Each structure stands twice: as structure tokens, then as C-alpha cells.
Swiss-Prot record:
Motif 'HIGH' region, chain ranges: 36-46
EC numbers, comma separated: 6.1.1.18
Chain span(s) of sequence motif 'KMSKS' region: 273-277
Organism of origin: Shewanella oneidensis (strain ATCC 700550 / JCM 31522 / CIP 106686 / LMG 19005 / NCIMB 14063 / MR-1)
Entry-linked InterPro entries: aa-tRNA-synth_I_CS, Gln-tRNA-synth, Gln/Glu-tRNA_Ligase, Gln_tRNA_ligase_bac, Glu/Gln-tRNA-synth, Glu/Gln-tRNA-synth_Ib_cat-dom, Glu/Gln-tRNA-synth_Ib_codon-bd, Glu_tRNA_lig_a-bdl
Name used for this protein in its record: Glutamine--tRNA ligase
Length: 556
């Protein structure tokens, strides 16, 4: 179950079904499961399913299992098993009991396959892959029966036994369910339920050389675990017929309150790919730095970018659960993290593109300490110490020699307030041989610390800064959307919609209070955005901050 609280319990069609099942007495408890295949890293789409399954279990005082669908050993890895568990925990959830694996049930699944053979409902087929595809037919044309479909039960038992003993080659034969080759649903045209794979399995080793297919395994695993509501995305809607057929034809699962499958729409998020294959292509071709690249939609990538468990859970609650496929605006996810960080992130000052400022009438060699609030509306976050001296750095964009009235920053001959400090006035500047401004010389009003000028003059602009001798060097990674198209999945190739400007790296300075910023610590860098300390590359010797989200939605 979850260890997190939900302010408002959401309502959706699945919860309505559960309410009715409990009211009618069909079920007296609720048991769900999250069943990922350990062949990749979880992404934001999986987070929707995690929040749904664990959230329902929590709200109905039920249980939620974590079960790995590990029936495809060639594509699976123990590293994925470990990362998925870590991601689920990080999101704030805890499964019931031990981690479960479909492979826990391989012996029972084998017995159930034998039961279907004995009932004349499964047969060993020697059609190759191309022949099987040809015999299956199309959506417009019915399939035709395999020449092996009417093999006697005793012979099928013998052949399946030989499959189990490894006496056939991979692809030489497979066990198929005997259903209906004329069914309008392709999944019901005698689907394969066991195939031969001479592959080492991360849980069972080399015990098995035949492995059950997902559609055969999934429903039986649900039933064995007494799952009351098996929640899947809409692409499994047709497969529900096979789900029910398997359980309908096995003696152990005839109870009227057995598990049922319900489908909901998967998450489609703007500017985001969810396909493991396409995401893997980005990683393999080094178009991103890895599965945890902050531009990736993986949980690891979102975490490194600075998204929090609470913001992801809030996003999943806001988008809701429906049967209708739709595209969710990326701005909604941004809003969830922006709102949370606005409330909880301490403020700090960082200068991403430093420009030196010398305050000529400030005493040389003097460094004073200014107390600044860590949060403008949360006194419980306390204060931090800012050093202030004769030399400071401001952002290069915050000074112009000439500007119109809309420019509320430092202009030659005019005043601006330094955040948490004094009012300064630009007097002159130095330039290099190419005309670039290198230093701005200012004067300051010593009687303006924490108050307006005594003579009542108005100073409208406020800019951020850092003190030159105490500021810490830092790298800032400024992330934008990885794709230029709101629907990158529709593009013929990923390359044509890849954003060449999705990452800009700049080197600047942060105030001294951030010298030991812990990994994943979030800050609002005033006037810049919300950032977090990178959880891989940042250290006291080399500070690295990732842009999580802008202060406001630039896509509005």
C-alpha cells in the first residue's frame, strides 16, 4: 500500500465499479497489482498506473502487489528489477509482502497448460512463424485451421513433454490454445501460449526452456494472487476476451468473484515519447546521456531533472482515469512541480552569465553579512547569510547602456535595487576590444539596506547578484523540451523532431550558502527558475544545477 496521503479522493469509472462490487458483496476487499516487465526503466506513463493501482489499494484499505511479468528472459535484466523497485518506493508507495514474479508460478502455469491439453483446448503446432501468420488471416479475412489442430490429446501431451525436455529447436513448434480461427478478434485465433526459448532466466536460471506467453501468464497470475480488479491500459481491451477464456476453462478459477480485467486510457503527454524502443534508440545513439538524462520521461530522468514524488502524484491525480484517449498538455506537468516548488523550495541567488560590478564608494576590503529570508512567505524556513562587498557579479542581461522605460534593470546613469541589499547606480563601464562590456562601475546609497531612499525617490527595478569573493562556481544545465513537435510519436523518424537546443550548459556563480548543496535539493534561483542539484555530477568541488522548470510557463 501507499505511505502517502491524498487530500481529496478522486472519482473515476474504475472506483465506481469497485464501489458497486463492495456494495453488492461481490468482493469484501480490494486487491490490485502493478505488473511491469523488467525490460526497461519506468517512465511517466507507468507512474499513472502506479498511482492508480497503489492509490486504489490505499483508499479502500486494500493491498497492492508488485509483480514482475518476467516471461521473456532474453530482454529482461535484474538491473531493471532493482530500478523499478527503487522507482516505486521513490514515488511514495510500498507493495504488499514480498516482490512477486510471474516466474514464481512457472510450475503451476505448466500444469494449467497440461490441463488445457487434456481438455482438448490446446495443441502443439509445428507451423513456422511465416506460416502461422498466413494461417491467422487478417482483420477482414478469417484464419484457417492449423493442420496440427486436431492432433490427439495423448500425442499433444507427448509433444509438449518433449518441448519441456528441450528436444525441439527454438521456433520448431509452440503450444497454441484451441479457440476460434474465425474470430473477429485476432487474439482469439488460436494464440500461442508456450514457446521454446533456450535462455537463462534471471530468477529461475536454466530450469526452463519453454516459457509461457504474457496473455496466458497474466490472467492466471492475477487469479493465483486473488487480484480483485486487474487494471490495464486500453491496448489490452481485446485481450480481455483471451484473459476470460483462459480462466473460464481452468477448474481452479470458477468462482463468481474471480478477478476481472478493466481498461483505462494510457498517458499521452505532449512533446514526449513513451515507446521503450524509441527511447532506447535515443540512448543507444547517444542523443541523450542515458536513461536518466533529465530530458527523458523516465522516472529516473524526471527525478534527476528535479521533479518530486508529490508533483508526479499530483499530476496523475489531475489528469484522472478515463477510457478516452487524449493528449495531455505538458504545461500541466510543469504546473504541478512549479506549484510545489513555489511553496516549498528555499530561495537563493545564482548568476548564470556573470558580469562584474565594482561599487566604487563601498569601503575596500570590507565584507558585510546580510540576513535574507529563505522563503518570502514561510518564516519557518528561516534565513540565510549573504556576503556583500565592493565587488559583485550580476547577470549580463541585467545591464544596458541605454534602454527604454520597460527595461526595469540597471541602466547607465540610473538606479536599481540589489535583491536583499542596497540601491546602486551605474556610473561607467569598461569594454574589451570587441566592444563587449567587461565591468560596470557603480555607486551605492549606504542608507538603503532594507528600506527605500530617504529622499523618497522611486527605484523600480530589482536584480539578483552574488558577492565576488565568496560566490561559488557552478555549472547550470538549462533544459528545454527534447522534441519540437507536440506529438513526436507521429513523426516518421525521431531525428526530424529532435530539438537541437534542448540543452544549454552555462558556467556561472551561486551564493555561498549553496556551497554544499545536497543532491536533488531544489531551489528557486530568484528571477531565473527552479533548479536542483544534479544527483550524479554535482559535488562540493563541482556544483551542477539542473533547470527543473521556469518561473512561469513560457508556452502560454
Amino acid at each position: 500500500m501507499s505511505h502517502v496521503d491524498t487530500e481529496v479522493r478522486p472519482s473515476n469509472f474504475i472506483r465506481n465499479i469497485i464501489d458497486e462490487d463492495l456494495k453488492s458483496g461481490k468482493h469484501t476487499n480490494v486487491q490490485t497489482r502493478f505488473p511491469p516487465e523488467p525490460n526497461g526503466y519506468l517512465h511517466i506513463g507507468h507512474a499513472k498506473s502506479i498511482c492508480l493501482n497503489f492509490g486504489i489499494a490505499r483508499d479502500y484499505q486494500g493491498l497492492c502487489n508488485l509483480r514482475f511479468d518476467d516471461t521473456n528472459p532474453e530482454k529482461e535484466d535484474i538491473d531493471y528489477v532493482n530500478s523499478i523497485q527503487a522507482d516505486v518506493r521513490w514515488l511514495g508507495f510500498q507493495w504488499d509482502g514480498e516482490v512477486r514474479y510471474s516466474s514464481n508460478y512457472f510450475d503451476q502455469l505448466h500444469q494449467y497448460a497440461v490441463e488445457l491439453i487434456n481438455k482438448g483446448l490446446a495443441y502443439v503446432c509445428f507451423l513456422n512463424a511465416d506460416e502461422t501468420r498466413e494461417y491467422r488471416g487478417t482483420l477482414k479475412e478469417p484464419g484457417k485451421n492449423s493442420p496440427y489442430r486436431d492432433t490427439p490429446v495423448e500425442e499433444n501431451l507427448r509433444l509438449f513433454g518433449k518441448m519441456r525436455l528441450g528436444e525441439f529447436k527454438e521456433g520448431e513448434c509452440a503450444l497454441r490454445a484451441k479457440i476460434d480461427m474465425a474470430s473477429p478478434f485476432m487474439c482469439m485465433r488460436d494464440p500461442v501460449i508456450y514457446r521454446i526459448r533456450f535462455a537463462h532466466h534471471h530468477q529461475t536460471g536454466d530450469k526452463w526452456c519453454i516459457y509461457p506467453m504474457y496473455d496466458f501468464t497474466h490472467c492466471i497470475s492475477d487469479a493465483l494472487e486473488h487480484i480483485t480488479h486487474s487494471l490495464c491500459t486500453l491496448e489490452f481491451q481485446d485481450n480481455r476476451r483471451l484473459y476470460d477464456w483462459v480462466l473460464d476453462n481452468l477448474d481452479d478459477f470458477q468462482a463468481p468473484n474471480r478477478t476481472r480485467q478493466y481498461e483505462f486510457s494510457r498517458l499521452n503527454l505532449e512533446y514526449t515519447l513513451m515507446s521503450k524502443r524509441k527511447l532506447n534508440d535515443l540512448v543507444t545513439r547517444k542523443l541523450v546521456t542515458g536513461w536518466d538524462d533529465p530530458r527523458m520521461p523516465t522516472i529516473a530522468g524526471l527525478r534527476r531533472r528535479g521533479y518530486t514524488p508529490a508533483s508526479i502524484r499530483e499530476f496523475c491525480q489531475r489528469i484522472g482515469i478515463t477510457k478516452q484517449e487524449n493528449m495531455i498538455e505538458a504545461a500541466m506537468l510543469d504546473a504541478c512541480i512549479r506549484e510545489e516548488l513555489n511553496e516549498h523550495a528555499p530561495r537563493a541567488m545564482a548568476v548564470l552569465r556573470p558580469l562584474k560590478v565594482v561599487i566604487e564608494n563601498y569601503p575596500e576590503g570590507q565584507i558585510e553579512t546580510i540576513q535574507a529570508a529563505s522563503h518570502p512567505s514561510d518564516e519557518s524556513m528561516g534565513t540565510r547569510e549573504l556576503a556583500f562587498g565592493r565587488e559583485i557579479f550580476i547577470d549580463v542581461a541585467d545591464f544596458r547602456e541605454e534602454a527604454n522605460k520597460q527595461y526595469k534593470r540597471l541602466v547607465m546613469g540610473k538606479e536599481v535595487r540589489l535583491r536583499n541589499a542596497y540601491v546602486i547606480k551605474a556610473e561607467r563601464c569598461d569594454k574589451d576590444s570587441e566592444g563587449n562590456i567587461t565591468t560596470v562601475y557603480c555607486s551605492y546609497d549606504a542608507d538603503t539596506l532594507g528600506k527605500n531612499p530617504a529622499d523618497g525617490r522611486k527605484v523600480k527595478g530589482v536584480i539578483h547578484w552574488v558577492e565576488a569573493t565568496t560566490a561559488k562556481p557552478a555549472q547550470f544545465r538549462l533544459y528545454q523540451r527534447l522534441f519540437t513537435d507536440p506529438n513526436p510519436a507521429a513523426a516518421e523518424t525521431v531525428d526530424e523532431v529532435l530539438n537541437p537546443n534542448s540543452l544549454e550548459v552555462v558556467n556561472g556563480l551561486v551564493e555561498a550558502s549553496l556551497a554544499n548543496a545536497p543532491a536533488e535539493k531544489a531551489y528557486q534561483f530568484e528571477r531565473e527558475g527552479y533548479f536542483c542539484a544534479d544527483n550524479k555530477d554535482s559535488s562540493a568541488d563541482h556544483l551542477v544545477f539542473n533547470l527543473t522548470v521556469a518561473l512561469r510557463d513560457s508556452f502560454e
